[in-house]
């Protein structure tokens, strides 16, 4: 059996990391740094839900029409030329993500991607519990709602987008509630996950903690 340290640092080995956590916990930044450090393909699973949300808006589909949303999820194709980093799109994505059939349809594609990619880090809400339960390393990161809201606020401000901090805080609290209470793939740490609170840590510090965990993990 190949140990975790060898899988991580030997690029000839297959290596899968699941990176889960709530909205704006720092998953994206941390995931990209880890991907570069360990020569992994990085994939953000929320993109498929945001793409579906965008398609619902573009095709004027009422998201309360469950059958229509499910049908649209069966033929989803990603468009890399679209800016999906929008709070309205994110809010709709969170709402349609609670639909069991939608999650099953989109997760099928995500599972195939994990299985066919030798070295990958996939980031989301239920990667370690549903999409890649056999991942070599399962990470769950979190932070307080206020800290996460400030991070999201700063991200949007940097992009020149108008936003109100209090509204972002409420959106994050509501999104957390939906994520934790949905029937399929609720937000929770996977069994055996390395759990990190990033409230007082920079992305680099989190990566250092993950690296030390890998080096010292006894399998």
From Swiss-Prot:
Binding site residues for ATP: 21-29
Gene Ontology MF terms in the entry: ATP binding; CMP kinase activity; dCMP kinase activity
Domain of life: Bacteria
Cellular component annotations (GO), alphabetically ordered: cytoplasm
E.C. number(s) listed in UniProt: 2.7.4.25
Main location: cytoplasm
Catalytic activity field: CMP + ATP = CDP + ADP; dCMP + ATP = dCDP + ADP
InterPro entries found in the cross-reference section: Cytidylate_kin, Cytidylate_kinase_dom, P-loop_NTPase
Cell location: Cytoplasm
A GO BP annotation: pyrimidine nucleotide metabolic process
One matching Pfam family: Cytidylate_kin
Keywords: ATP-binding, Cytoplasm, Kinase, Nucleotide-binding, Transferase
Family (UniProt): Belongs to the cytidylate kinase family. Type 1 subfamily.
UniProt name for this protein: Cytidylate kinase
Source organism: Rickettsia typhi (strain ATCC VR-144 / Wilmington)
Gene: cmk
